[in-house]
Amino acid sequence: SVDITLAAAQSADIVSAQVNSHMPRTLGRSFVHVNDVDVIVEHDEELLTIGATADSQQANIIAKHIARLVDDGSTIQIGLGTTPQAVMLALSGKNDLGIHTQFLTDEVMHLVARGVITNRRKGVNEGKIIASTAIGSKSLYEFMHDNPGIELYPSDYVNNPAVIAQHNKMVSMNVAMTIDLSGQVAADALPSNLFSGLTGMLDFVRGAAQAENGKSILMLPSTNRNGKRSRIVTVLADTAVVIPRSDVSYVVTEYGAVNLFGKSLQERAVALISIAHPDFRDQLFHEAKNAGLLSRDRSLAESLQGIYPVQLEETVEINGQELVIRPATPVDTRRIQEHFYALDGKDVVSRFFYEKTRFNLEEIEGVSQIDYVNDLTLLALVGDPGFRRVVGIGEFLFDPAKNLAEVAFSISKEFQGKGIGKILIRKLGAAARDNGIAGFIAYTSHKNESMIKLFNSLPFTIK
């Protein structure tokens, strides 16, 4: 560990050093000159090692969500624990990742062996893994010994936000203990047990935010270990705030990922409730209303009780442009509204059967706030994560009396005729079958040739 050890050695009145042949020799700024040491003790002993943590289904699901947010060529920083370990395993399909992190672990070594971590596209210290501390197995220490591809530096360099911000696609990934509905994060201690001291988490959160195409991701299970307490709370109490709400962007639980950047307090509350454990959403909703985070007239949408169907997510490429297909969430209300306003008059009539000129938020909430079973809305989006815009919508609303669902679609003009409608109806059909729905009903004008052609192209019986 170079971390703060080098600074301590440079500042201390008396410096004692142990010479241990088991200690790996690392490059970088990890040396103390013998003339600066007052006492030398020669003593060999095994180094502290830690093994792999127990497998966790929660951690594996969170890891899959996070892996979708990490692009090829990203430089990553990641914390310690079960979930970060699962995240590193989930990144095994990526290419040309780089490492600039506090903690070097066995998972980094494994990704280097697989060729996932190359450090070729970092922008700073290219070709080098940069860290300040290593903790892992004996194999990790052997891997580090005299390895020219690994350099250790003190915390004043590794944790410097200005240095972190110089990296290409810098992604910080850290574990939060608790987050409140405004976005304030507690991460370093339990109430009344403030033993862990300061962390470097905020340094990486801010450095990643300043980096070009950088991202800050916070991960946490939705509940504590016994499932009796939500880790998403209305207001943090008796707990130190490690990350202010103004610095928080992506938050990920096993129930999904949300981006809080640029969101109002009400939008933040809705977003975080949507990824809380379903058993606590009702309580959080009513507490948020009482705390003034949600307006009094807001109702508890069914989507806050539904389980987000992550299996319906898909990324496709159309004419060289990446499109993300995914179910709508409560925080999509504004972008769905913007999509409808961007439609031309003809497309508005095709979708709503009259010249509709106003799309009130109350109406749009019926599209974005869904239960994913009786009603489902799929969105096609383009753009960077957190700033994507809707270019296509496919939705169904279930009629239990007929065991049929009514479907409707709208596609932005520049994306019409590119197959988005087929993708949306294929995924809607698969979801409907899984939910036991017998078929679809669609109402359209006889002049809407593109919609008629779409339905006739499907491998379904058309009546």
Language-model region placement:
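Long, contiguous binding/interaction regions
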Residues: 307-463
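Flexible domain-boundary/linker segments
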Residues: 87, 125, 161, 200, ...
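Long, charged amphipathic helices and adjacent flexible linkers at domain junctions
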Residues: 53, 297-315
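Conserved phosphate- and dinucleotide-binding cores of soluble alpha/beta proteins
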Residues: 1-299
